[in-house]
Amino acid sequence: MFKSELLTQGFSTLLNNPQALLFATFGVMLGIVIGALPGLTATMGVAILLPFTYGMEPVSGLLMICGVFFGGVYGGSITAILLKIPGTPAAAATAIDGYELTKQGKAGLALSAATFSSFSGGMLSIIVLMFLSPVLASWALKFSASESFALATFGLSIIASISGESLIKGLIAGVGGLLIATIGLDPMGGFPRFTGGFVELMNVPFIPVMIGLFAASEAFRSMEQNQQIRQGAKVAIGSLLLPWQTLRRIALTILRSSGLGVFIGMIPGAGADIAAFVAYNETRRFSKTPENFGKGEIKAVASCEAGANGCTGGALLPMLTLGIPGDAVTAIMLGALTLQGMQPGPLMFTDHGDMVYTLFVGMIFCYFMLLVLGLLSLKVIGNVVKIPGNILTPMILALCVVGTYALNNSLFDVGIMLIAGVVGYFMQKGGYPASPVVLALIMGPMAESNFRRALSLSGGSLDFLYTRPITLALLTLAAFTLLTPIIRKIMRLRRQ
């Protein structure tokens, strides 16, 4: 049960601990910078900071990690909108419409909407975390391998919605992504598949592929055209004030997408990237003008960021109440709590209730700082789009190389990134979208591993596909999502 007296005590504790507030602010700012840099993720930032929290006061150390987590999820949207370079996997969905708005001279609108949506989604997720954590976490525990497979299948069906003008080309790109996702260690047997003898391919190099498809390919195209890296580079960011009319228009979208993000975040293995794409798809499905998506729809930007940041609180739910991390970041945070002598789980709310509620208050503070620091830093980070193309193009390529190399100190990863960049360049020329490839790389391993696990648990029978209500509902929704664009196209042709 929610205890208001502990929340009040948490406020008092935090107000009397300026050091914790300072470290939380530092964490948010560091997270924004890390998220904005291609190849660097919130997971990496949290992992690097983890050893330093051991000698720190518990609240300060844990809030600094929370700040990096929250800021990292949001930071990827900045370069995704301005340069179509997703700083994080979750920002790949934001880039679809965010960059189109930049090309239309509406970069300021897109950035302010992304910042406010990130703040709102994160705040709503923390409120849910405070009030409903025991109930929601126990419900999320019902997701077995079959439900997780169905969720991944639903995620893959979203390819139909993000394929742009050609569904066939989008599906081809998605199949290509699924094939790439099979490279590496078999999820059940542990033996290498399609690695060609390269040890580096034991795990699919997802981040290098994403950087190559989205960033390097754009730089290659710019060099061919011998012009500025983007037409958007000639456009000032403009006002960062979000108009009241726009706020009213996206309010329901933010609320719905935040809820989806919280729900998806609670499911182990489903992170902010999945939440962003699912929120994008659902917003498009509910929209009266779905044809505007992919062409600069502000609701799309709001939905992706609200969903991704709503996932943060959702991922913390099972970690804090059941000791089950929702994603890689919360797994590291679980380690941080253990280092501080606290064992996440049901007993944590009774043994360390005051600490838990102090963290809740600190998380709210982190999101307020994200809103303030996010808006203040946009102009600084956004100045990159004013740099001439003959300077910016080599800078972007250098950033791609450095960011990729920093992942594992591996030149092999750099080679993978450059190959993906060349492939992405030819995909652009042929009209094949890159987003389905990224989505398939995210969802493919999750779908395969959970399907095989569910098949093993059912003794080789496929009855788990239709005997479990949640699994059946998600698979039905996936079929509906996949068929909707086809039905719409047929109806459009009939009208003509």
Indicate residue ranges for each PLM-predicted region.
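Membrane-embedded alpha-helical modules
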Residues: S112-Q227, L339-L493
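Membrane-embedded alpha-helical segments of transport systems
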Residues: F70-G75, F116-V128, I180, A302-L316, ...
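Re-entrant/interfacial helical elements at transmembrane boundaries that shape
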Residues: A42-F52, I65, A80-E100, F131, ...
